Amino acid sequence: MRILLDDCGYDWDKAWNIITNTFDYTNHTVMAEALETWDVDLMQRILPRIYAIIVEINNRYCAHLMEVTGGDSEKVTRMSIILDNRVKMANLCCAASSSVNGVSKLHSEIIKDSVFHDQYTVNPDAFKNVTNGIAYRRWLLASNQGLTNLLTECIGDGFKKDASKLADFKKFATDKSVLDKLAAVKLANKQAFAKYVYNTTGTKLNCNGIFDVQVKRLHEYKRQQLNAMNIIADYIYLLNNPDADFVPKTYIFASKAAPGYYMAKQIIKMIWCIGEELKKNPKLNEKLAVVFLEDYKVTLSEILMPASEISEQISLAGTEASGTGNMKLMLNGALTMGTYDGANVEIHEAVGDDNIFIFGMSTPEVNQLKAEGYNPEKIYNSHAVIKSVLEKMYKGINGATFEEVANSLRHADRYMCFADFDSYRGTQLSLIHISEPTRLRCISY
């Protein structure tokens, strides 16, 4: 608007018409703290002309809203771009865009039902869905040469230009020779990743065990803490049952936390400490290991994705906009275990119950539990495994205590880890015991 008004000399109406026919708004989060707002005084001081234009946009927008809502001042206040001495950037985006979309079917419904419900009721035709996607050539052809070669051998190279051709691989789902080659590709990728980890960290990985992967930004809603709770539960079980028949498993984490996000950094520290304590018990560590990789980036991801066997997509239902790691990992043959959230919903529709393992509450069930009054303390007092896990956090892991993580779960549990714990742990156990041929048939879909 500033360029069109000040540099090009357009009048307001012509400039605004160009703006609203040029811009579309893609929302990427339902987290209130991630919907950016700016302090009015700061903006006025640093960007006085921009702020003056925003004020005029808001005045005209609110006047228009008063007309179309029949004078509903409460709704207009909620939709206002400037409110409580803050400039609400998401509201500005909605006002200035010809269309608004989420990045998965579920997310797009959520923004219509809650995040931008007022805007949707005023202009429903502007809202649509555009599900996220990935550059599959990077995450398959460039990252997983062994699988690419096997696919080319089996179905030709048409899939390199047309991803839908990958469906032709289904016909080999019961072909033992192809499944054997698929298993060999996966093992080679695991060995390559293990070599990278050893060269960079000095940690040796057991390639005969399962590689269970959760790689994404560290945030409580993504529930790395739920994953950690399950690992601690396994650790306690193995301490009490050292000779138990336990399928070896390595849990691999890689993520970064926002600089000022204290709780996320505590969770990172806790995961790292779990891995370090496990190393001190070599016999147990052969069965259960944890690796937290620093400086997560695309080049590391290109080595990790092909080596992964279980993909953890475990956000609380209704909190993940889409996710793309779920797509990258599944493309490379990892079995997905996840909640009915984000793009998991559409993946489930595409591949069916046998090829993605859904656990936990649905979004309506989450909302219902919140409305009824969620009480994590009650679950803590009645659930022996959860209680033992938190007691371990209180007592210490590798010499460090994690009272703040434990208390946050016990007294608030904003993202309902306790409520989904049994379902999550049960799915973990069932997934581990899926036979190798079945796992390979699944990933050929």
Question: Positions of the model-derived regions?
Answer:
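Extended, well-ordered alpha-helical scaffold/bundle regions in very large, multi-domain proteins
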Residues: 3-59, 141, 149-168, 249-255
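Long, K/E/R/D-enriched contiguous segments that form extended
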Residues: 23, 30-31, 191-301
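Polar, glycine-rich mid-to-C-terminal structural blocks
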Residues: 45, 49-98
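Segments forming glycine/polar-rich beta-alpha architectures that bind adenosine-containing cofactors
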Residues: 93, 101-159, 195-198, 214-245
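Extended, charge-enriched "interface" segments that sit outside catalytic cores
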Residues: 143-204
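A donor-sugar binding/catalytic signature common to diverse glycosyltransferases
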Residues: 309-354
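Long, C-terminal catalytic modules of enzymes
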Residues: 370-431, 435
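Residue-level detector of conserved catalytic or cofactor/ligand-binding positions
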Residues: 432-444
